[in-house]
């Protein structure tokens, strides 16, 4: 047997009192199955995160079946057994295992204790379920999962290194060096202050030497003024560093976010993306306010400890003993603290997503009489988030109380022992006062150091959340060839195009080949759900096909570069949106230089010019992101005008005239046809189909 095989067998042995099941929250709306597998793998020693699983197993936004989860588990080296069982039989399951929950979700059953069931829910965290609730939501299907013969204990997690983040900031090293030097001066003064007090009490007062007293006081005043000036300069340098980090980190992450593929956004909620982006602020705040403090606290702990040994001898070991007790308590409770922190972040993000979703659909909410229901659901989510915050605050208060108690006990013991040494003439009063001052600094610095180190561990949580965005591969690849911007009408061709939502599902379309000549108009028809919109997104470069190619003028769009390709085409999709600004800005795409004549011509072609001119402010009329004050047909015509303004070589239209009356639709179709643009449209209306050169059914 090789050493590697022996280590694998040892890793499979459970030699601890109890193996912990980690809590992993799902990021995408339909990856609860992956999260459950990640939790169980972590329990058995294979530490993997959702980023790794998502890359290896491309699941659909529509979710996974139990059979799909079973297949993924086997690829991870796990053995499985699917069971159909009654509620009373849950006690005999090998835990942790996966339960099918409420016919639309998967959770991990951790343990069964009498009539209480402990679940790790990827959507809600740790839950303690009663028998009645379990009976209501458990569907009777479970999946036992345990290490198979090919299972390996390993760590497959994705992180962003702090070094790479720091090196990405221009001017940060020089600023850090300046802050460090200023901090050394401040901390040196802090060490000198108790020495000055000791000199006054042991030399100036007993000798009645006012000259020495004045000299020491003047020196202390000088050091105080120097400390104040240095502290102000350090605060300004910290502000400069914070600004540098804030601008460069946020701009870099936002630019990366905008370049991620569309599928990234379709599988996530906006509130969760916002929450992950906000985690960057938490990292920045921790780095700018705590890293320098951590370095100086470390130096001061050593320096103060040396001073205590010089002044107090064995009393120093008493201080170290009480300090160790506090550190031990913090370390023991760290796991629970991190779990509550993650729970708080996830619940806040869920409430924010629900809030934005409600506002985006406010008209539907009102018409369907859902105001009370949506309000109650949001309130419940917000209360869950607040309760998590209360748990976190409660733990902070507990730690503060423990620190106060330990420090007080330490102070009393040192007072009793130190006073005894003074009485026995083994220590002067000045030395005792100085030692007490050093003891206070030591306890304060160690508590701060412990909090920072644990906070740094908590930062790994924010690191994971940011990594989900920052380490996701961008859709843009470096173009291999240069393309002239204005190419006129463009030919479109596909060769053997195939696409599926994930590796577990059947293809939406397979080996699809079609060609559209320059200036030709083609309509794509088919039954609802046949994949027309998905095909359109593949043709537009929003989705990458599993196989096959999309070519324009005989050139693969991947050679051109997705961004370059998007500059050559225009799309009007079913779910298009307007942005906050004027109608002029929306039609012109918020360009710095706007072509007034061309804008009006595009508005006339989309049959919206007269409507705009009848508005009090004309093209300067302000609209919001939801397009308030405009009908559905008016919005669609503005979308079409916006697409035409780009002077595209190909115009893609997905039910782009579905909200128009027949007269307006006919006018728009004829106007666009006369522009000699290659058109690919999805439509069902006969009036639209009559204006195209060819119809393709899928």
UniProtKB/Swiss-Prot annotation:
GO cellular component: plasma membrane
InterPro entries, A to Z: AAA+_ATPase, ABC1_TM_dom, ABC1_TM_sf, ABC_transporter-like_ATP-bd, ABC_transporter-like_CS, CvaB_peptidase, P-loop_NTPase, Peptidase_C39
Alphabetized UniProt keyword annotations: ATP-binding, Bacteriocin transport, Cell membrane, Hydrolase, Membrane, Nucleotide-binding, Plasmid, Protease, Protein transport, Thiol protease, Translocase, Transmembrane, Transmembrane helix, Transport
A Pfam family annotated for this UniProt entry: Peptidase_C39
Gene Ontology biological process terms from the UniProt entry: bacteriocin transport; protein transport; proteolysis
Active site: 32
Binding of ATP, residues: 526-533
Family the entry assigns: Belongs to the ABC transporter superfamily. Colicin V exporter (TC 3.A.1.110.2) family.
Entry protein name: Colicin V secretion/processing ATP-binding protein CvaB
Naturally occurring in which organism (per UniProt): Escherichia coli
């Amino acid at each position: 047997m090789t050493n590697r095989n022996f280590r694998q067998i040892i890793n499979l042995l459970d030699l601890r009192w109890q193996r912990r099941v980690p809590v992993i929250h799902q990021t995408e709306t339909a990856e609860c199955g992956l999260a459950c597998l990640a939790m169980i793998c972590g329990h058995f020693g294979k530490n993997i995160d959702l980023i790794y699983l998502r890359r290896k197993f491309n699941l659909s936004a529509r979710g996974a079946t139990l059979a799909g989860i079973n297949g993924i588990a086997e690829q991870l080296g796990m053995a499985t057994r699917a069971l159909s069982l009654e509620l009373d039989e849950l006690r005999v399951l090998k835990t942790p295992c996966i339960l099918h929950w409420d016919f639309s979700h998967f959770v991990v059953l951790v343990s069964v204790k009498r009539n209480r069931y402990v679940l790790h829910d990827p959507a809600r965290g740790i839950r303690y379920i009663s028998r009645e609730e379990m009976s209501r939501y458990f569907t009777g299907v479970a999946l036992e999962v345990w290490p198979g013969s090919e299972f390996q204990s390993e760590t497959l997690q994705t992180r962003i290194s702090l070094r790479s983040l720091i090196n990405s900031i221009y001017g940060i090293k020089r600023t850090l060096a300046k802050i460090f030097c200023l901090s050394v001066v401040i901390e040196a003064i802090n060490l000198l202050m108790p020495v000055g007090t000791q000199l006054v009490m042991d030399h100036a007062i007993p000798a009645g030497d006012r000259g020495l007293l004045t000299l020491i006081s003047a020196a202390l005043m000088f050091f105080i003024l120097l400390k104040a000036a240095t502290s102000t300069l350090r605060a300004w340098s910290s502000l400069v560093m914070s600004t540098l980090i804030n601008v460069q980190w946020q701009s870099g992450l936002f630019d990366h976010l905008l370049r991620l593929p569309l599928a990234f956004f379709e599988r996530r909620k906006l509130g969760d993306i916002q929450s992950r982006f906000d985690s960057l602020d938490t990292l920045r705040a921790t780095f700018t306010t705590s890293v320098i403090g951590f370095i100086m606290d470390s130096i001061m702990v050593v320096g103060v400890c040396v001073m205590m040994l010089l002044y107090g001898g064995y009393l120093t070991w008493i201080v170290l003993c009480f300090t160790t007790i506090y550190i031990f308590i913090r370390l023991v409770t760290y796991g629970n603290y991190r779990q509550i922190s993650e729970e708080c972040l996830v619940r806040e993000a869920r409430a924010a997503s629900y809030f934005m979703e409600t506002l985006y659909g406010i008209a539907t909410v009102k018409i369907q009489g859902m105001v009370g229901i949506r309000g109650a659901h949001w309130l419940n989510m917000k209360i869950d988030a607040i309760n998590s915050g209360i748990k976190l605050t409660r733990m902070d208060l507990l730690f503060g109380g423990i620190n106060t108690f330990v420090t007080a006990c330490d102070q009393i013991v040192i007072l009793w022992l130190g006073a005894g040494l003074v009485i026995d003439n083994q220590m002067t009063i000045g030395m005792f006062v100085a030692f007490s001052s050093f003891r206070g600094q030591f306890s304060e610095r160690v508590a701060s150091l412990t909090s920072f180190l644990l906070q740094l561990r908590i930062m790994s949580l924010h690191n994971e959340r940011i990594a989900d965005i920052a380490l996701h591969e961008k859709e843009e690849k470096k173009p291999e060839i240069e393309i002239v911007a204005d190419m006129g009408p463009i030919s479109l061709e596909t060769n053997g195009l195939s696409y599926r939502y994930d590796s577990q599902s059947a293809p939406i379309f397979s080996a699809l080949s079609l060609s559209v000549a320059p200036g030709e108009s083609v309509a794509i028809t088919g039954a609802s759900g046949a994949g027309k919109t998905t095909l359109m997104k593949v043709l537009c470069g929003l989705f990458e096909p599993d196989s096959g190619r999309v070519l324009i003028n005989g050139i693969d769009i991947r050679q051109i570069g997705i961004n370059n390709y998007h500059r050559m085409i225009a799309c009007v999709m079913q779910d298009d949106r307007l942005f906050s600004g004027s109608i002029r800005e929306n039609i012109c795409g918020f360009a710095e230089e706007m072509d007034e004549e061309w804008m009006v011509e595009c508005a006339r072609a989309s049959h919206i010019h007269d409507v705009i001119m009848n508005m009090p402010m004309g093209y300067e009329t302000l609209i919001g992101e939801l397009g308030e004050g405009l009908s559905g047909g008016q919005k669609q015509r503005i979308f079409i005008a916006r697409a035409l303004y780009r002077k595209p070589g190909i115009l893609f239209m997905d039910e782009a005239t579905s909200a128009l009356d027949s007269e307006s639709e006919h006018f728009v179709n004829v106007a666009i046809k006369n522009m000699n643009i290659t058109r690919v449209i999805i439509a069902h209306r006969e009036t639209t189909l009559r204006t195209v050169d060819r119809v393709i059914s899928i």
